């Protein structure tokens, strides 16, 4: 099939012949994922993302552990901000590929968007149980940052600050964690020097970010430096 695609491309012919042949193959309901995945990749190469979606889902029906298909569908769901679809893909993803931290991460974000705080907290804690020595520190940091946000939503401030501290151990430049940690400290009127230092780092990193500028200005106001 690959050779047929190459020959078709080299001959300068349109994609109709290739797609027709693939559709005939798909009608036979193949029990291996290789050909459907090749078909999906071909459709994507032609910019036919919408048509590729059902084919990729068929790949997952045949082989739920196929990360290429799931990640491609997930990428499209993220671009569309389709949080329900993100949940569907990632809930299945953490079961079929429990060591893929990306599925936990996007699932936690989707749960947050749905205001399912306890679920976001639980999935992040589950993700941390799968962290290995070679896991990306930035990703681990993000999980702790989400945990911090979740604990703060539940008014568990001490637990939130401990989670933010862990986030910054793994990635001292985690801008989101720095900003939220600084802001929440300032609201409580505690550790204001620490809050100012953290907030300053966010402004230095992204000087045109209005959210970080507002946090920094607020902390200075609370400290009386205005």
Map each language-model feature to its residues.
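Residue-level recognition of tetratricopeptide repeat
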Residues: 41, 75, 109, 149, ...
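Structural motif corresponding to the intra-repeat A-B loop/turn of tetratricopeptide repeats
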Residues: 11-12, 46, 80, 114, ...
